[in-house]
Each structure stands twice: as C-alpha cells, then as structure tokens.
C-alpha cells in the first residue's frame, strides 16, 4: 500500500474506510511520528500523549499503530481504551498531557474509522498544526530517533472510565439526584456503552439500556443518535420519562420526550439557553447555532432576548464562533452541544445531564419544556454521491435550485452542502407548509441523484 497523504485532515480530523487510505496502519504509524515531531519541535524532553478509541474492530490496529509511531519518537503514551471523545479531551487536561488522540469515526458505520487530535488544553488542534503534521508525513522528516532507554513506553490507564464518570457527575448539582426518573438510554454500541449507564445509574435513575452490547461491527447500526426511532418506541413501551440517544463516540445527543416525540439539538439548545438566561448565567445573552438551525427555533430564542451567532455546520466551527464571541453555549441540530463551562468539545452525557437538571428544577416534563417552541416545517435528506463535484458546476442542479427558490420566495430557504465526513450531499428545504417542503426537497434530490448519485462511500 502507498501513503497518499494529501490531504489527510477533513472537517473533523482524519476519517475514512479502515485499511484504505488515509486510514491505514502505515499512515497511522507516520501520523504518530508526526504528532511526536510537532511536540518535540516545541521543546525537547519528555512528552505524554493519551490515546482513546471507540468500539470499532479496527480500533485495535490503529491504537497499536499510533502508539508505535509515538513511542518510537520517545513519547510516553497513556492508553485509555474505549471512552467517549469528550472523555479524551477531559483526561488530556486532567493528566496534563501534551496531546490527546481519539480513534473514532463518530456516527459513521463500523467499516470506517478516524482520528481526532487534541492539544494540551483539550481543544482540537487547529489548521496550522494539521498542515505541519501533513508536511512532516509528506517529507517523512520527523526529527532524530531516540536510542536505547530514550524510546517511549506505553501504559494502560486503568481508571480512565472512572475518572470520566466522576467528572460527568460533577456537572450535576450536588445534593440533587435523578431518583424517580426512568430513562431509556441508547449508546449506539459505541464508546459510551459502559460510561453512560454508570453516570445515570449512580445518580439514582432507573436506566433501561439499548445499544450497550458492542461487537466491534455494530456501532451506529440502526441505533443511537442517528436512529432515535428505537428509543421513541422504547419510551412508550416502558412508560419512561425521557429517552437519551448518543452516537458512536458520545459527543452527540438526541432526546425523546415522555410522549415519544424527538427533541433534536436545536430544541435542546433552546432549552439550555433559556435556562441559562433565566439564571443570568448566559454572558451577553448569546449562543452559537448553525446555518442548519430551524427558523422557528431562532425566532423563539430571539423572542427571549437571546442573541444568536450563526456558524457553518460542524462542532469545530461552532466552537470557533463561541471563542470569538465569548459564548459559553453552542450547538447544532445534529446534537452536538458544547458547554464551555464544562468541556472543550461536544459531550452527549454532560448535555443530557443539563437537560435533566432543568426538568427536575422546574418540575417539568421534557414535553413541557418544548411546548412553546414552534419549529418551521423542514425537510432534510441525505443523498449518497459517487464523488463531491463542486455544486455550482452542476447546471441542472443550479436550475432546480433557482426554481425552488422562486416557489419559496421570502418564506423559505434551501441549503445544499456536502458532508465533511461522508460522501453525502445534504439537501435541506424549509418553509411554511410541510407538504410543500417535502415535495420540493424530493425534487432537488431527484436532480442531485441523477447528476452525481452513487453508492455511499465514506471518506
């Protein structure tokens, strides 16, 4: 196999099908060396890097490959085992490590895998560092190799999950419990399969678990945040108070109310923003949302006197805008929620705890908390594509977009964009009438499929 390294990094780290470039063992060893090289450029001496993963079968080989590359350069590595992505960010800070690495393809199917890299402060590395890593791999110039006793060693951190569990519980008010709440929890057979049940059970909730039996090949398969229909049915069947669905690496959250209705990231953001403003704990009454955020949600937030900064899609962009505007809360429709008071990245478990706290303190059901939020009709369809051709170069697509815009007028909008992590084109149409937006979205989808449709191939 050859090492095609240009470019390695996408919108959320490195991602692709396991054993296909860039997600090969060979490239992962080089990546480990390059991360070490960047650290050693900053200062010589000892460095520590923590390495976590989700439950994919291919995680074992990438874990070993990355650790081999790092230790060959004299870096000490701390192996965390299966743990949510926000757990890696937290433990990187807690252990005063120089970097953290998470091996995961998030919500993608098990055949894919990916690598996310965190700096010592727990934030994902920036573009400049990514480019330096890519340059090192391209040139295979990492600096001198250590000799004899100077090579690095690897240690397994036995209490990594326990540390993260205690951290997550500490974001819930002391003296309060979840006693009396029946929760349906879907962990997508992913990284949170042991952590999440423990957090909620130790806070005295009754937890009914789904998606907590990973096989290495079933992560995100018909379950988790991408398939909330599982917990919709389960909440009704078990007469539960709430449903919680996480994705494969535990950084996304979708909830279901006691009536079986989905509460997506837009609505969860609204609930938490409203609570923070009520408690006068929302700096400048500002939150960050994305271009996908429902217009009805934006109107609701604005009616509360909350200013909304709009960012491109992706938790990286949300975080960047949060830092620029000094916001402490941001999120997106897909379920990424960032509470900067607690963590440096999206955290599904911590986000769920904040919503549960609001329910308990206000003595409200989840449906009570969403009752005053009226969403605009919106249709979102994912179209698998053979390859990502620039959309403005597709004349038939541009023609149908213009036709749909004229039909919607000022009462609606269209958003057409490629996924940053999969070979998918996302078609979103929003308006005032549900049947109309569904029909118009289907019209656009038909043209996109005719132009560039194909079997789904993850990046």
Swiss-Prot record:
One MF annotation (Gene Ontology) recorded for this entry: phosphoglucosamine mutase activity
Residues recorded as bearing Phosphoserine in the entry: 106
Post-translational modification: Activated by phosphorylation.
Pfam families named among the record's database cross-references: PGM_PMM_I, PGM_PMM_II, PGM_PMM_III, PGM_PMM_IV
Record bears the keyword Metal-binding: yes
The EC number(s) this enzyme carries: 5.4.2.10
Record's catalysed reaction(s): alpha-D-glucosamine 1-phosphate = D-glucosamine 6-phosphate
Keywords attached to this entry: Isomerase, Magnesium, Metal-binding, Phosphoprotein
Amino-acid positions noted as binding Mg(2+) in the UniProt annotation, renumbered to this chain: 106, 247, 249, 251
An individual GO BP term: UDP-N-acetylglucosamine biosynthetic process
Membership in a protein family: Belongs to the phosphohexose mutase family.
Function comment: Catalyzes the conversion of glucosamine-6-phosphate to glucosamine-1-phosphate.
Name of this protein: Phosphoglucosamine mutase
UniProt organism field: Chlamydia muridarum (strain MoPn / Nigg)
Gene name linked to the record: glmM
């Amino acid at each position: 196999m050859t090492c095609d390294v240009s470019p390695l990094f996408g919108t959320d780290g490195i991602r692709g099908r396991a054993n296909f470039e860039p997600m090969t063992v060979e490239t992962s060893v080089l990546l480990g060396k390059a991360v070490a090289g960047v650290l050693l450029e900053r200062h010589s001496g000892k460095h520590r890097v923590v390495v976590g993963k989700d439950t994919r079968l291919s995680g074992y080989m990438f874990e070993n490959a990355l650790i081999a590359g790092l230790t060959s350069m004299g870096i000490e590595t701390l192996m965390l085992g299966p743990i949510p992505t926000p757990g890696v960010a937290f433990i990187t800070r807690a252990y005063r490590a120089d970097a953290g690495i998470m091996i995961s393809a998030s919500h993608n199917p098990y055949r894919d895998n990916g690598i996310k890299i965190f700096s010592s402060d727990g934030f994902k590395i920036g573009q400049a560092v990514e480019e330096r890593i890519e340059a090192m791999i391209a040139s295979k110039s990492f600096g001198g190799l250590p000799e004899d006793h100077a090579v690095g060693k690897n240690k397994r951190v036995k209490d990594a999950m326990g540390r993260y569990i205690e951290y997550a519980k500490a974001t819930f008010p002391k003296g309060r419990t979840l006693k009396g709440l029946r929760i349906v929890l879907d962990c997508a057979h992913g990284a949170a399969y042991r952590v999440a049940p423990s957090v909620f059970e130790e806070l005295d909730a009754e937890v009914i678990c789904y998606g907590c039996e990973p096989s290495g090949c079933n992560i995100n398969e018909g379950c988790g945040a991408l398939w909330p229909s599982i917990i919709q049915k389960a909440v009704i069947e078990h007469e539960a108070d709430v449903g919680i669905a996480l994705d494969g690496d535990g950084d996304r959250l979708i909830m279901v109310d006691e009536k079986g209705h989905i509460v997506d990231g837009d609505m969860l953001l609204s609930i938490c923003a409203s609570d923070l403003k009520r408690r006068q704990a929302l700096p400048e009454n500002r939150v960050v949302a994305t271009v996908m955020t429902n217009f009805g949600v934006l109107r609701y937030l604005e009616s509360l006197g909350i200013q909304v900064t709009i960012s491109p899609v992706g938790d990286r962009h949300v975080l960047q805008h949060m830092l620029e505007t000094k916001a402490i809360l941001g999120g997106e429709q897909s379920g990424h929620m960032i509470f900067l008071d607690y963590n440096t990245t999206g955290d599904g478990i911590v986000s769920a705890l904040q919503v549960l706290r609001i329910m308990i303190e206000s003595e409200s059901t989840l449906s009570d908390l969403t009752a005053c939020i009226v969403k605009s009709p919106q249709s979102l369809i994912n179209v698998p594509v053979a390859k990502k051709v620039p959309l403005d170069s597709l004349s038939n697509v541009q023609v149908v977009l213009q036709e749909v815009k004229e039909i919607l007028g000022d009462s609606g909008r269209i958003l057409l964009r490629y996924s940053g992590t999969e070979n998918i084109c996302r078609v979103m149409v929003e308006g005032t009438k549900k049947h109309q937006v569904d029909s118009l979205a289907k019209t656009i989808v038909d043209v996109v499929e005719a132009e560039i449709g194909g079997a789904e191939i993850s990046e």
